[in-house]
Amino acid sequence: MEAASTWALLLALLLLLLLLSLTLFRTPARGYLPPGPTPLPLLGNLLQLRPGALYSGLLRLSKKYGPVFTVYLGPWRRVVVLVGHDAVREALGGQAEEFSGRGTLATLDKTFDGHGVFFANGERWKQLRKFTLLALRDLGMGKREGEELIQAEVQSLVEAFQKTEGRPFNPSMLLAQATSNVVCSLVFGIRLPYDDKEFQAVIQAASGTLLGISSPWGQAYEMFSWLLQPLPGPHTQLQHHLGTLAAFTIQQVQKHQGRFQTSGPARDVVDAFLLKMAQEKQDPGTEFTEKNLLMTVTYLLFAGTMTIGATIRYALLLLLRYPQVQQRVREELIQELGPGRAPSLSDRVRLPYTDAVLHEAQRLLALVPMGMPHTITRTTCFRGYTLPKGTEVFPLIGSILHDPAVFQNPGEFHPGRFLDEDGRLRKHEAFLPYSLGKRVCLGEGLARAELWLFFTSILQAFSLETPCPPGDLSLKPAISGLFNIPPDFQLRVWPTGDQSR
């Protein structure tokens, strides 16, 4: 009897959803939106957008509907998609304020709930972003102090590589730990040893989160979270990973609170936030709350751990796949720096080919191919269409970095595309791995510095080899969703000048 009642309730619910979907799709609201495939009740555009191939499906639709079109992710989530350099720059650059809202990430929204510098909107976001940028700058980002901080961690990574003594190893964990330590130093004022079990668990949680939100299931969840959320599934493991990150963050914040003094200088981002909280504690409308503190630093920890490490890993993979490129990079480093002097940020101008290789690695990887979701902050006209306030927008950053109108043969690895006739670095306005506009990655300066110093220092210290034939290495992302995640590979490193081989 109870089973029959349950099935009757589910049937009634499905019928209600069907009627609601039909009602929504009959409204004239689509008239002012860009064209797109007709959505089906309950399914939206599932037939055109298969989870696991969401990005490629959107690119395929752009060939039919043009660079600006509308899709439905599930029955109600309506998204305007921007494809190619011209459309994305016109929106995020030309109408930056109107396109500056943060859209939905269903896999993470339950945890962040509109709090923290990344997920906030409106006045909350403006205050948190301004504060975070100033705090990072005051702590040395973009200055000599920040460079020295990164160089110290580089030395620790080089020493860890040396301990492998020519044995094959997967560099993923060490690279993630090294880049995470830079963030931990700035945010929490700590550095953790690579063999620390808690640190390794945090890295594994960050990696699991990245995999979870980019996986085919993660893409399905973005379309049907209303259906999948109450059911058992991989999202429970994702919540476990996020819980591990949050627990580590809470632990570090509580340590700061235990020794916090309002009269002392800020030693890290958490200190700076606590000082701001103390200054505004009498303001009932303040955005400097413990919730925003925890969500801001949790995001910084996650983003700073996985994104930079993944990019360095892909750059090393490319050098294994193309040994002649690695040889040319190493020759440039030896010629300009010699074996003894550590690379610095000021060396970029002296190492144009090395810089071009790093640019091309970022372009080819297209780490965030779908871009981060935006929303329209006020009803606006764009290319003859009227986009209502609250409309979600996907600016496909990967479609810029692989735009054949800008980059000839975009699927090929060709560092020379970033060099001019005189061998100097050529800047491309379509080189936008960090997006653009008001939501441009707030850690862009730090990311660029880390990529340069880690990459050049590794290549100065070691020659790189793969245990397998270079031609057998795949450059295709292991998972392609919100993020393009590079495949795992085995690496062997030999100290420069090693005569024992």
Swiss-Prot record:
It is found in: Endoplasmic reticulum membrane; Microsome membrane. It catalyses: all-trans-retinoate + reduced [NADPH--hemoprotein reductase] + O2 = all-trans-5,6-epoxyretinoate + oxidized [NADPH--hemoprotein reductase] + H2O + H(+); all-trans-retinoate + reduced [NADPH--hemoprotein reductase] + O2 = all-trans-4-hydroxyretinoate + oxidized [NADPH--hemoprotein reductase] + H2O + H(+); (5S)-hydroperoxy-(6E,8Z,11Z,14Z)-eicosatetraenoate = 5-oxo-(6E,8Z,11Z,14Z)-eicosatetraenoate + H2O; (12S)-hydroperoxy-(5Z,8Z,10E,14Z)-eicosatetraenoate = 12-oxo-(5Z,8Z,10E,14Z)-eicosatetraenoate + H2O. InterPro entries: Cyt_P450, Cyt_P450_E_grp-I, Cyt_P450_E_grp-I_CYP2A-like, Cyt_P450_sf, Cytochrome_P450_fam2. Its main location: endoplasmic reticulum. It holds the Pfam family p450. One of its GO terms (biological process) is retinoic acid metabolic process. GO terms for cellular component: endoplasmic reticulum membrane. Its EC number is 1.14.14.-, 4.2.1.152, 5.3.99.5. The keyword Transmembrane does not apply. SUPFAM superfamilies: Cytochrome P450. It is a peripheral membrane protein. Heme binds at residue 441. GO terms for molecular function: 12-hydroxyheptadecatrienoic acid synthase activity; heme binding; hydroperoxy icosatetraenoate dehydratase activity; iron ion binding; oxidoreductase activity, acting on paired donors, with incorporation or reduction of molecular oxygen, reduced flavin or flavoprotein as one donor, and incorporation of one atom of oxygen; thromboxane-A synthase activity. Keywords: Endoplasmic reticulum, Fatty acid metabolism, Heme, Iron, Isomerase, Lipid metabolism, Lyase, Membrane, Metal-binding, Microsome, Monooxygenase, Oxidoreductase. Pathway: Lipid metabolism; fatty acid metabolism. Its cofactor is heme. A cytochrome P450 monooxygenase involved in the metabolism of retinoids and eicosanoids. In epidermis, may contribute to the oxidative metabolism of all-trans-retinoic acid. For this activity, uses molecular oxygen inserting one oxygen atom into a substrate, and reducing the second into a water molecule, with two electrons provided by NADPH via cytochrome P450 reductase (NADPH--hemoprotein reductase). Additionally, displays peroxidase and isomerase activities toward various oxygenated eicosanoids such as prostaglandin H2 (PGH2) and hydroperoxyeicosatetraenoates (HPETEs). Belongs to the cytochrome P450 family. This is Cytochrome P450 2S1. The gene is Cyp2s1.
